[in-house]
A protein has these predicted regions:
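Residue-level signal for the nucleotide or nucleotide-sugar donor/cofactor binding architecture
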Residues: 14-20, 49, 76, 80-83, ...
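C-terminal "lid/loop" region of Rossmann-like NAD(P)-dependent oxidoreductases
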Residues: 9, 37-41, 49-55, 63-80, ...
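Glycine/proline-rich active-site loop of Rossmann-fold NAD(P)-dependent oxidoreductases
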Residues: 1-3, 19-20, 24, 28-41, ...
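Residues within well-ordered alpha-helical secondary structure of globular protein domains
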Residues: 28, 57-60, 94, 109-113
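Conserved donor-binding loops in enzymes that form glycosidic bonds
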Residues: 12, 44-45, 93-94
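Amphipathic terminal alpha-helices
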Residues: 100-115
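Substrate-positioning beta->alpha
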Residues: 6-28, 38, 50-53, 102-106
């Protein structure tokens, strides 16, 4: 049988940004004169994915048979987090190079080797 994986707030949605892409955005923004004094988001606007579906994607990468069991989580957690990247994009014109699947795979591979 399949193992169970408990996932809090499985219906909440998020976007994710691979660290290399975040660092590249921060460096470019720090060097851009028009970014001074502005509040700018660093992240990814898409794809937006539920925490439950994210868990399913990770389980697939791990090649495990697991059943996702949704659980209640903290009530103060926002149900949706998706940054508005328009101003950052306008200033530096940067699109993240690592899509979600690549970022998850690279993170999983790193953990397998290092943890």
């Amino acid at each position: 049988g399949a193992s169970e994986l408990s996932v809090q707030n499985a219906s909440h949605s998020r976007t994710f940004c691979f660290i290399e892409d975040a660092v590249e955005m921060i460096v470019r923004l720090s060097e851009h004169p028009e970014s001074v004094g502005k509040v700018l988001n660093v992240g990814n606007q898409a794809p937006e994915i539920t925490i439950g579906n994210l868990a399913l994607e990770i389980v697939k990468i791990m090649k495990k048979k697991m059943t996702i069991v949704p659980m209640d989580g903290p009530t103060h957690s926002p149900s949706r987090r998706c940054p508005d990247m328009r101003l950052t994009q306008q200033l530096i014109g940067y699109d993240p190079k690592n899509d979600l699947a690549t970022g998850l795979r690279r993170t999983y591979d790193w953990y397998r080797v290092n943890i």
